[in-house]
Amino acid sequence: MCDDEVAALVVDNGSGMCKAGFAGDDAPRAVFPSIVGRPRHQGVMVGMGQKDSYVGDEAQSKRGILTLKYPIEHGIVTNWDDMEKIWHHTFYNELRVAPEEHPVLLTEAPLNPKANREKMTQIMFETFNTPAMYVAIQAVLSLYASGRTTGVVLDSGDGVTHTVPIYEGYALPHAILRLDLAGRDLTDYLMKILTERGYSFTTTAEREIVRDIKEKLCYVALDFEQEMATAASSSSLEKSYELPDGQVITVGNERFRCPEALFQPSFLGMESAGIHETSYNSIMKCDIDIRKDLYANTVLSGGTTMYPGIADRMQKEITALAPSTMKIKIIAPPERKYSVWIGGSILASLSTFQQMWISKQEYDESGPSIVHRKCF
């Protein structure tokens, strides 16, 4: 977009990463961890310009001396003071814009508590003085980004996973299923199974190292039992990873045992169904006439769907659950890590969307509850 002064801002606040940029762009300009860090120790050097809190990449780079906190847990904001810091950082440091000059599109998890959307709305209008704002459901944006209006979205990020059936652009709320099992749980699980190998990772800073191991080395096995047998009989699946201090560790069956928890949550001591069964259950809660369209348009979205092998495994598992004649297609766009943001960018730049914004005037007249009437 040439006239940046009126471009809407699109901010996708994930539990793990915040994606932000301008409507009409094809990718977010800023992607940084949703982390606020505070020093663990007393500063002794005068004139160092030490701050009482750090956000995003700066917190990440100084993680050795900080306690890191994620203000968004399971897709829901739990610490509003820290969340304000993240938004402030987004507008002023990352995008370098004045929020009072741009409409802002925010995203939220499906089945989010109502009070949460109200608080988001309130902070945007009262703290940042935005002229207009809107809150969109993440999975719906992912479907827009894939160029569809009908399908079932399996959106799995760092904090929460949900399956959202959408028909002709409408999310079907009775069939949305939510699973509190996502990337952060997999990182914690990998920390645990690496401990069984004799490597100890305990601090919040070390958890970030394990997250990197997970992102670089893990994959989903097509057949878990068979893969376990292969790993036991040969070292062909072993990979080495160099830690920041130069020590090299070896990772074997942990590479696929970690994301296997998505399909078998019992690995984490959870009773819920895996992502394949949750997707199937979501489809089965829909009207019998639209199921065929949903099976043929199963769209993966979010960072936790980035594991190599996940689409093939989903195809195999859902085929086993569905009627034998059903055509099943899993769509895994290469940019699915950012598809929520991309969908937001598309939505906010549509001419038909311009009347959907909640304006400052409407907010002043109705208060925060306006969000339930205008955003659905």
Swiss-Prot record:
InterPro entries: Actin, Actin/actin-like_CS, Actin_CS, ATPase_NBD. Its main location: cytoplasm. It catalyses: ATP + H2O = ADP + phosphate + H(+). CDD domains: ASKHA_NBD_actin. One of its GO terms (biological process) is actin cytoskeleton organization. Pfam families: Actin. Residues 1-2 form a propeptide. SUPFAM superfamilies: Actin-like ATPase domain. The modification N-acetylaspartate is found at residue 3. Its EC number is 3.6.4.-. GO terms for cellular component: actin cytoskeleton; cytoskeleton; membrane raft; striated muscle thin filament. It is an enzyme of class 3 (hydrolase). One of its GO terms (molecular function) is hydrolase activity. It is found in: Cytoplasm, Cytoskeleton. Belongs to the actin family. In this organism there are four genes coding for actin. The sequences coded by genes 1 and 3 are identical. There are a few variations in the actins coded by genes 2 and 4. This is Actin-4. It comes from Caenorhabditis elegans.
